[in-house]
Amino acid sequence: MALTLGKKNPRGSVGLDLDGAFVAAVQASDGRISRAASMELPSGVITDGEVSDVERLTESLKTFFKENDLPTRVRLGVSNQQIVVRHLELPLIEEEAELAAAVRFQAAEAIAMPLDEAVLDYQVVGQATSAEGSPRLRVVVVAARQAMIERFVEGVRGAGLKPEGIDLNAFALVRALAKSEAAAQAPAAEGELDAPVQDLACVYCHLGGVTNLAVAVGSNCLFTRPLSTDWSEQGDLVASALAEEIRLSIDFYMAQPGARPVGEVQLSGPGSTHEDLAEELSALIHLPVAVADPLGGLDVNGALGGEDPHRHTVAAGLALGASS
């Protein structure tokens, strides 16, 4: 099954986040969440974002969907070390088939993964101008190991579910949390960085079963990587280790052509509520750090019940991808 970055799926599909520590599902459309549920996953079913035990994943999903009476059409999210994200600049190409061929040709050189063992997708995220003054397309290309994707799909289909799209958790995270265009055009508040908000990148750091980082300008995710820090540990070492990984990620992102300066860091996921974590990180990386509204301003309308909203950020972003 292919990746479906930015592709439309049937309205009503459920965003399904297989976090590792838990599974979360959200159904949303028109800015409103209609259903949401989550359940703990047994230890060892998913490890470092990859399916370790297909049979137990299938049984867990059967139980979860039956108990919560959820629709069977789902949009999956993935995040692990078997995924590579790269930026390409290409000549301005209008024909879709020609663009796809050009992306694949350049991806073979840019991505250290045999493309015959990978699923590949891309998104055009804007335009640039070359040194000679000619227009160029800015493209984000994603490659994922096919064997890894197939294990997710096998586990999901075994539970009687119908996967209708596969997205990156990082893209879903940005989709759920990115500020609206109107907010992005607002001037900076007193004491904030002087650059216009729309010219700054935002770092999103999701502290779930997998710690995931994304850098975005507006709603365009330009860089992503899973982090190794275990936020569930206590003490100052967590903030210190996480700050170092965030710093290194920002440095790597800033080395890319056309990178925008980072203006802030937004934390999400269950780990984002750890006491004083945002303040400690801000002091260590010298950037504003805040805990994001976990559902990005979506109308919940009582759909969460007693659920922890911080579990549902990625699933909500996946659901928004299905409903857009």
Located regions from the model:
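Hydrophobic/aromatic-enriched cytosolic interaction surfaces used to assemble or bind macromolecules
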Residues: M1-S324
